[in-house]
A protein has these predicted regions:
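Extracytoplasmic
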Residues: 1-158
Length: 158
């Protein structure tokens, strides 16, 4: 997982202060769900996803993604205190550097929904080889987290 902060990371001894996304440490001590492959609880969620934050995953094998089916992405997250959007980008998080937006998810502040879906549109030129995937967080409100981000699935629909 790759993540950036809109204002960088500041050290305030003995801690670090993040202005955007970071991976929250999760400890399994005294956890009744403890188990190596237990998906009932989120492990190491990406938190503090403020406007301008970018979270990326390298690399997805696009050769394994079916071309003859419609695609959706399921995002598991917890909405927080501000409305926002998550742009799903392939190749780069910036269109000026060759990135292509393949989906968009709107997140409503305080929503109790935990699964959000986005229809995906992947251009043929990016539908091959290994491609990096990025989630770009946007909001009209600066400095407030849009959501806690747990995981995602790419789904092929007939």
């Amino acid at each position: 997982c790759w993540h950036t902060n809109p204002g960088g990371i500041k050290e305030v001894y003995p801690h670090y202060v993040y202005t955007g996304s970071y991976i929250r440490p999760v400890y399994r001590d005294n956890n009744p769900y403890a188990g190596d492959n237990n998906h009932k609880i989120p492990f190491a969620p990406v938190v503090n996803n403020t406007s301008g934050s970018i979270v990326g995953y390298k690399y997805l094998n696009m050769n394994a993604v079916p071309r003859d089916k419609s695609l959706q992405m399921q995002l598991r997250l917890k909405a927080e205190d501000t409305d926002g959007r998550i742009r799903i980008m392939l190749g780069s998080p910036w269109t000026t550097k060759g990135g292509v937006e393949i989906g968009l998810v709107n997140v409503k502040a305080g929503s109790t929904c935990r699964e959000f879906y986005a229809s995906l549109s992947i251009p043929a030129k990016l539908h091959k080889g290994k491609q990096p995937l990025f989630f770009v967080f946007e909001s009209e409100t600066e400095g407030q987290s849009i959501c806690e981000f747990y995981d995602f699935l790419m789904l092929a629909r007939p």
